[in-house]
């Protein structure tokens, strides 16, 4: 049994070698010749999986180690009788922590408290729900917009997108990309929406590039609209609008979900799905794969305030480390993908062990995802 895996899927070679012969290949582009005798293909979001790639090939199963699936033609796979699995929620925590790192940086730079801001969350799936929970743990007001979930009657106080635009100081997008249909998200943030945002609002896109109309956004920024912008995703990736990058406050190369934990979850989820598909079901404990955290333990004295939270968050991950490299190489062919391929190891907040002498600080840090314990001062 021959299994092709994206060369940038961590732990993929070791895990999938339990099931067959593994060959690691680049994800963009997939070497077509390698598909001629392969039984399974494991990809990331950079690989377009459709009829033109797989027609006439012996592939029986496709796995994507990503939460999003808009790079996969699922309808054609089903029609062709090819098994498929994604990894929903695998990088949700990573994206939430990216958003927090960005907001805490902007709050420090511009001198505001997040408690004074209302956050509108567009898309309340794996990422949106976790983001809501962590924001509300801090006492920050959230507004939720998710028309598909609202129409299904899912639990939640869902508002219209117009309401979020009117009332939110921060608008953050966490939707799939739907190019048409009743829940179309292509250019959901169009010129009209962008112009309607509150003065000084913060716009964040960490889902799919085309959810925000990049041309319209650049037009508004060029005209002097007072707006802070965080973009991790771009229309036309791996190409991007260099002029837009110059205008945004934070710009990164589609790495919001790139924690070691998130990547490992994605790999293990598709590994488990494929093992079940071939009748050799196996399960993997994530902590058996991950290396020891870079930091040992941190001692925190007193209650948790915003500056202290910012220091803890940026100790684990400061978004500026990914902004600067993109600006240096933007517009150079191949460099966007190179930044992603050679991405520095990044951990999640749970990798930081915090000893608190304040019980409320320990409790709050645990709710936020840190590995915190309370030890009273002696």
UniProtKB/Swiss-Prot annotation:
GO MF term list: 4-phosphoerythronate dehydrogenase activity; NAD binding; protein dimerization activity
Gene Ontology CC: one annotated term: cytosol
Primary site of residence: cytoplasm
Protein residues bound to substrate: 45, 66, 258
Pathway of action: Cofactor biosynthesis; pyridoxine 5'-phosphate biosynthesis; pyridoxine 5'-phosphate from D-erythrose 4-phosphate: step 2/5
Magnesium as UniProt keyword: no
Entry's transmembrane regions: none
Physiological role: Catalyzes the oxidation of erythronate-4-phosphate to 3-hydroxy-2-oxo-4-phosphonooxybutanoate.
Top-tier EC class: oxidoreductase
Oligomeric form and interacting partners: Homodimer.
Family to which this protein belongs: Belongs to the D-isomer specific 2-hydroxyacid dehydrogenase family. PdxB subfamily.
Residues reported to bind NAD(+): 146, 175, 232, 257
Compartments where found: Cytoplasm
GO terms (BP aspect): 'de novo' pyridoxal 5'-phosphate biosynthetic process; pyridoxine biosynthetic process
Catalysed reactions listed for this entry: 4-phospho-D-erythronate + NAD(+) = (R)-3-hydroxy-2-oxo-4-phosphooxybutanoate + NADH + H(+)
Origin: domain of life: Bacteria
Identification of the protein by name: Erythronate-4-phosphate dehydrogenase
EC number in record: 1.1.1.290
Organism: Escherichia coli O6:K15:H31 (strain 536 / UPEC)
UniProt entry keywords in alphabetical sequence: Cytoplasm, NAD, Oxidoreductase, Pyridoxine biosynthesis
NCBIfam families reported in the protein's UniProt record: PRK00257.1, PRK15438.1
A Pfam family matched in the record: 2-Hacid_dh
Active site residues of this protein: 208, 237, 254 (proton donor)
Protein's gene: pdxB
Family annotation (SUPFAM superfamilies): Formate/glycerate dehydrogenase catalytic domain-like, NAD(P)-binding Rossmann-fold domains
């Amino acid at each position: 049994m021959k299994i092709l895996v994206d060369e940038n899927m961590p732990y993929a070679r070791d895990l999938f070698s339990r099931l067959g012969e593994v060959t690691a290949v680049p994800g963009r582009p997939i070497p077509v010749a390698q598909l001629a005798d392969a039984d399974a293909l494991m990809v990331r979001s950079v690989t377009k999986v459709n009829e033109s790639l797989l027609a006439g090939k012996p592939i029986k199963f496709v796995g994507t180690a990503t939460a999003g699936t808009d790079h996969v033609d699922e309808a054609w796979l089903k029609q062709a009788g090819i098994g498929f699995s994604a990894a929903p929620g695998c990088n949700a925590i990573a994206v939430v922590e990216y958003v927090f790192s960005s907001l805490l940086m902007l709050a420090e730079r511009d001198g505001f408290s997040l408690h004074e801001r209302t956050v509108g969350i567009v898309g309340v799936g794996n990422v949106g729900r976790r983001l809501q929970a962590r924001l509300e743990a801090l006492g920050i007001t959230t507004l939720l917009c998710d028309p598909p979930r609202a129409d299904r009657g899912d639990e939640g106080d869902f508002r219209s997108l117009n309401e979020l635009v009117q009332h939110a100081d921060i608008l953050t997008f966490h939707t799939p990309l739907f190019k048409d249909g009743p829940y179309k998200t292509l250019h959901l943030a169009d010129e009209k929406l962008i112009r309607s945002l509150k003065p000084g609002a913060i716009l964040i896109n960490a889902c799919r590039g085309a959810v925000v109309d990049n041309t319209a956004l650049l037009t508004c920024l060029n005209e002097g609209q007072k707006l802070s912008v965080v973009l991790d995703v771009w229309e036309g990736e791996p190409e991007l609008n260099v002029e837009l990058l110059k205008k945004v406050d934070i710009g990164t190369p589609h790495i919001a979900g790139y924690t070691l934990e998130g990547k490992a979850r994605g790999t293990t989820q598709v590994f488990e799905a494929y093992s079940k598909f071939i009748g050799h079901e196996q399960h993997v404990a994530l902590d058996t794969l991950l290396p020891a955290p870079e930091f040992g333990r941190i001692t925190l004295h007193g209650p948790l305030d915003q500056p202290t939270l910012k220091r803890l968050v940026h100790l684990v991950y400061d978004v500026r480390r990914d902004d600067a490299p993109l600006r240096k190489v933007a517009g150079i062919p191949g460099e966007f993908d190179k930044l992603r391929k050679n991405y520095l190891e990044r951990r999640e907040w749970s990798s930081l062990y915090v000893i608190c002498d304040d019980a409320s600080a320990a409790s709050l840090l645990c709710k936020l995802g840190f590995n915190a314990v309370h030890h009273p001062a002696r």
